Each structure stands twice: as structure tokens, then as C-alpha cells.
């Protein structure tokens, strides 16, 4: 007669719960552990949890510092939530960028300033694109808006540090000075200040670039240089009416209504534009103003329709 084989043993269920170094406190008769050993196990688990929490806090703090220091991660700080793997990948890309710049990025503050300047310029380009898309009555296939966005994108690609040698990194006091197609021979910085209409019309272009400078000294230098570069465009905007109703009111209230458009047209013809880039101001552009002033007998509605078609 065979003895029934018992596959279970009383010690098999409790062996897995015994930690290393706790064999002395284990009682083989009762199959339980003493109260002192149980409290030690709980204390060890608590200490392990505290150590793990501190380790996670250090990792999260280091990732937050990387997100603040890396320009590409800092750009997406308010737009979307970055994962830890994305922050690490952006850090690796930024280190590769510094190596590609000749290794001077670790110690050269000028190279880092160029990097942040490029980032700010691209952010301003995005603001201009959002502003153009929010304008009412402007179609998406507008040629002037498309030329403006294409021009700004080309300028942003020229500012990329990877495309330039480390020894010739430009850092002028005004961003538009690095663009050869926008430089023009103008009088000194003590030019006429901005008129209210011109400040409102040129806000998508001048203000976005001025805000890219953190210090007030650079902003003041930017304003003076902007007056020298955009002086011909501002004179043409100041001499031409900015809204269609302004010309119509002048023709109604002045007894000599024909002399007002003629003086405006003569002054606009005497000061030709000296820059190749035309701001996105359809109502104040010289070509649109000449066509509108040539037909002064038309109504204000027909004048606005012609400018809108341009």
C-alpha cells in the first residue's frame, strides 16, 4: 500500500515572505515571525519608499531644468506638454548643435545669444502669420501676405547658426541690419517720429521684432535704427490717407476739393520708395494711393473696392 504523496508543505508558503537576515526571528513551530521583525520589515519598506520618492524628485527637477535651458524645449513650454523622452531628445539635439558650432557654445555667450535670437525671430514670424490669418477681408491667397511670409521665412533661414561659420556669427544691434535687401541709404537716427496711423499699420512688422529684445537699451537702439530704415515708407504712408472715409470727408468739407488730392499726389510722386520690401499696408501703399487719387471723382465705396481688389 502506497503512502499518499503530499505535494504541499507547511513551509512552502512562508519561505517567500522571509527576507535575508531574518531567519533567526522565524519560528518553525508556529510558522510566524516575531513582532520585532515585522516592525523592521515595515520600517525598511518605508525607508525604501522615501528613497525612491527622492530619486524621482531629483529626476523631475533635472528634467525641468533641461526644459528651461534648452531653447527648443523652452519654446514649447506653454503650447504643449512635453514628455521626458522628448526633453532628453531635445537636449541631445542641442548638444549636437553646440558641437557643430565648433565647440564654442559651451563657453561663448555670443553663440548662445545668436541661438536665442534665431528662436525669437521665428516666434515673431509665427505671430505675423497668426495676425495675417486673423485679419478680416484678407484672403489666404493674398500675394502681399504670401510675399511677406516667404520673405520672413527666408530671413529666418539666413539666421540659422548651423549655416554659418562659428567665427562669423552676426549679432548686430538691430535684426533687419543683417538683411541686405532691406538696407537703404537714409539720414541719421534723428528722423521724424512715428505717426499714429503708421504705428498702427506697421505694428505686425516693427513691434514683433522690437519685442524680441529683452533689454530696454537694445529696444531703444532698435527704434532709432527702424526710423532710418523705414523712413521712406513712413513718409509715403503719412502723406496718403489711411482710410477711404478720410478722403471723402476732405472733399465734402473743403470748398476746393480738387486741390487736396492734387497736392497729395504730387508729394507722393516726389518721394519715390527707396526700399525693395513693401509693408503689408494695402490702404497706404504708393501704387494703391496713386490709382485711388487719379479717380478722385469716384465715391468712397468705389475707392475701397479698387484698393480691396489690389
Curated annotation (Swiss-Prot):
Region of interest (Disordered), residue spans: 1-21, 182-208, 248-310
Domain Orange intervals: 116-152
One GO term of the biological process aspect: Notch signaling pathway
Top-level taxon in the UniProt lineage: Eukaryota
Cell compartments where the protein resides: Nucleus
Annotated Gene Ontology cellular component terms: nucleus
Record SUPFAM superfamilies: HLH, helix-loop-helix DNA-binding domain, Orange domain-like
Alphabetical keyword list: Developmental protein, DNA-binding, Notch signaling pathway, Nucleus, Repressor, Transcription, Transcription regulation
Molecular function in Gene Ontology: protein dimerization activity; RNA polymerase II cis-regulatory region sequence-specific DNA binding
Polar residues bias spans: 293-302
Keyword Cell division: no
bHLH domain sequence ranges: 43-98
Function: Transcriptional repressor which functions as a downstream effector of Notch signaling.
Family: Belongs to the HEY family.
Name of this protein: Hairy/enhancer-of-split related with YRPW motif-like protein
Organism this protein belongs to: Danio rerio (Zebrafish)
Amino acid at each position: 500500500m502506497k503512502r499518499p504523496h503530499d505535494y504541499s508543505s507547511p513551509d512552502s508558503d512562508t519561505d517567500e515572505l522571509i527576507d535575508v537576515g531574518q531567519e533567526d526571528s522565524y519560528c518553525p513551530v508556529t510558522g510566524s515571525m516575531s513582532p520585532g521583525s515585522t516592525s523592521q520589515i515595515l520600517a525598511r519598506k518605508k525607508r525604501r519608499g522615501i528613497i525612491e520618492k527622492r530619486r524621482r524628485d531629483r529626476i523631475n527637477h533635472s528634467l525641468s531644468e533641461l526644459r528651461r535651458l534648452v531653447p527648443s524645449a523652452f519654446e514649447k513650454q506653454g503650447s504643449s506638454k512635453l514628455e521626458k523622452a522628448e526633453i532628453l531628445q531635445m537636449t541631445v539635439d542641442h548638444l549636437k548643435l553646440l558641437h557643430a558650432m565648433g565647440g564654442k557654445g559651451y563657453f561663448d555667450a555670443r553663440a548662445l545669444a545668436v541661438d536665442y535670437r534665431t528662436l525669437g525671430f521665428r516666434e515673431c514670424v509665427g505671430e505675423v502669420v497668426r495676425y495675417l490669418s486673423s485679419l478680416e477681408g484678407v484672403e489666404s491667397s493674398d500675394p502681399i501676405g504670401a510675399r511677406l511670409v516667404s520673405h520672413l521665412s527666408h530671413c529666418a533661414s539666413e539666421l540659422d547658426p548651423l549655416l554659418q561659420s562659428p567665427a562669423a556669427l552676426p549679432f548686430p544691434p538691430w535684426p533687419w541690419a543683417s538683411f541686405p535687401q532691406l538696407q537703404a541709404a537714409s539720414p541719421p537716427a534723428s528722423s521724424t517720429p512715428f505717426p499714429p496711423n503708421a504705428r498702427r499699420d506697421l505694428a505686425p512688422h516693427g513691434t514683433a521684432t522690437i519685442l524680441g529684445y529683452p533689454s530696454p537699451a537694445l529696444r531703444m537702439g532698435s527704434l532709432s535704427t527702424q526710423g532710418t530704415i523705414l523712413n521712406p515708407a513712413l513718409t509715403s504712408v503719412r502723406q496718403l490717407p489711411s482710410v477711404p472715409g478720410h478722403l471723402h470727408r476732405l472733399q465734402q468739407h473743403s470748398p476746393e476739393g480738387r486741390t487736396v488730392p492734387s497736392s497729395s499726389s504730387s508729394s507722393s510722386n516726389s518721394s519715390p520708395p527707396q526700399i525693395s520690401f513693401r509693408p503689408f499696408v494695402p490702404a497706404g501703399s504708393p501704387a494703391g494711393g496713386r490709382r485711388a487719387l487719379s479717380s478722385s471723382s469716384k465715391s468712397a465705396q468705389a475707392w475701397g473696392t479698387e484698393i480691396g481688389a489690389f
